[in-house]
């Protein structure tokens, strides 16, 4: 069986995108892991699957699988690639696209300059909904592991995020601390670990260690999480430029009770076929 796919990326965070509207494909966890291998497969951070809508008021359903085959609820960079893919492949001609995800409903917008804006919904800070084991909601949590103490913010952007403030993202121990915290017992479902350096109140640098993936060149939901946490800690403005290793995103959030929006690029690399 031949399955068509597209290779895409958002700021270097790379994806294989599958049209499961005109095709009917199932990938096992093991098969996803094989295809994600950069030496023996196609190579990607995540597999994105476009499915028919579950609700007639929505345009599509959006599924995301990490390179280890685990299914996750949200991916901001992937959402931008999803939006470009469905229009590029003629699955829709709309500039506003409503999709459902495992985490809920999101809205995607094609901008006139070719960039894509994603309505990421409201950041969720309630510990039980992140989920995070904590007695009460705080702007800064103390997490201990062995002889180390970490001060971090926590938020869900449809997936759990832990954000640490660092002096310099270039010298931060992203690999070591990331591995320590990504599956910490305080996060029952694991968490993506963000390392944020504040340049000024409207500009940050960020690196993210993602659960099930490791460090990537960019993490859209991680950028959203960092800005939301920074605002709650009274350190950031309502509009923030986020520099990631793979490029730049613009994040806008008016504060608690309002939706957060992310704007950035989505690039098509090539199309191919998988033999199953």
From Swiss-Prot:
Catalytic site: 75 (proton donor), 219 (proton acceptor)
Instruction: Please verify whether the record's keywords include Amino-acid biosynthesis.
Output: yes
Instruction: Give the location in the cell.
Output: Cytoplasm
Sorted alphabetically, which keywords does the UniProt record give? Amino-acid biosynthesis, Cytoplasm, Isomerase, Lysine biosynthesis
User: Which residue numbers mark the site Could be important to modulate the pK values of the two catalytic cysteine residues?
Assistant: 161, 210
- Hydrolase listed as a keyword: no
Q: What is its main location?
A: cytoplasm
Q: EC number(s) for this protein?
A: 5.1.1.7
Q: Which GO terms describe its biological process?
A: lysine biosynthetic process via diaminopimelate
Site Important for dimerization: which residues?
Answer: 270
The molecular function GO annotations come to: diaminopimelate epimerase activity
Listed GO cellular component terms? cytosol
Give the metabolic or biological pathway: Amino-acid biosynthesis; L-lysine biosynthesis via DAP pathway; DL-2,6-diaminopimelate from LL-2,6-diaminopimelate: step 1/1
Tell me which residues bind substrate.
13, 46, 66, 76-77, 159, 192, 210-211, 220-221
- Catalytic function, reaction form: (2S,6S)-2,6-diaminopimelate = meso-2,6-diaminopimelate
State the family named in the UniProt similarity comment for this chain: Belongs to the diaminopimelate epimerase family.
Subunit relationships: Homodimer.
Q: Which HAMAP family match?
A: DAP_epimerase
- Function text: Catalyzes the stereoinversion of LL-2,6-diaminopimelate (L,L-DAP) to meso-diaminopimelate (meso-DAP), a precursor of L-lysine and an essential component of the bacterial peptidoglycan.
What is the designated name of this protein? Diaminopimelate epimerase
Q: Which organism is it from?
A: Pseudoalteromonas atlantica (strain T6c / ATCC BAA-1087)
Recorded name of the encoding gene: dapF
């Amino acid at each position: 069986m031949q399955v068509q796919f597209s290779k895409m990326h958002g700021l270097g965070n790379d994806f294989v995108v599958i049209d499961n509207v005109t095709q009917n494909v199932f990938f096992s966890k093991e098969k996803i892991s094989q295809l994600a291998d950069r030496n023996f497969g196609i190579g990607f951070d995540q597999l994105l699957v476009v499915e028919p809508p579950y609700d007639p008021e929505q345009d599509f359903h959006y599924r995301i699988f990490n390179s280890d085959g685990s299914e996750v609820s949200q991916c901001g960079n992937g959402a931008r690639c999803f939006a470009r893919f469905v229009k590029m492949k003629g699955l829709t001609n709309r500039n506003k696209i409503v999709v459902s995800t495992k985490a809920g409903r999101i809205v995607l917008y094609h901008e006139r300059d070719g960039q894509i804006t994603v309505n990421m919904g409201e950041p969720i800070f309630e510990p039980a909904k992140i989920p995070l084991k904590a007695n009460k909601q705080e702007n800064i949590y103390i997490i201990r592991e062995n002889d180390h103490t970490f001060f971090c913010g926590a938020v869900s952007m449809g997936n759990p995020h832990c954000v640490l403030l660092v002096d310099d993202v270039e010298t931060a121990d992203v690999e070591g601390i990331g591995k320590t915290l990504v599956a910490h017992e305080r996060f029952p479902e694991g968490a993506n670990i963000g390392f944020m350096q504040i340049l000024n109140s409207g500009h940050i640098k960020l690196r993210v260690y993602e659960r099930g993936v490791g460090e990537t060149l960019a993490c859209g939901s991680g950028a959203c999480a960092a800005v939301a946490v920074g605002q709650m800690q009274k350190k950031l403005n309502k509009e923030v430029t986020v520099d990631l290793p793979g490029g730049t995103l613009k994040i806008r959030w008016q504060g608690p009770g309002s939706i957060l929006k992310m704007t950035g690029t989505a690039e098509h690399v090539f199309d191919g076929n998988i033999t199953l």
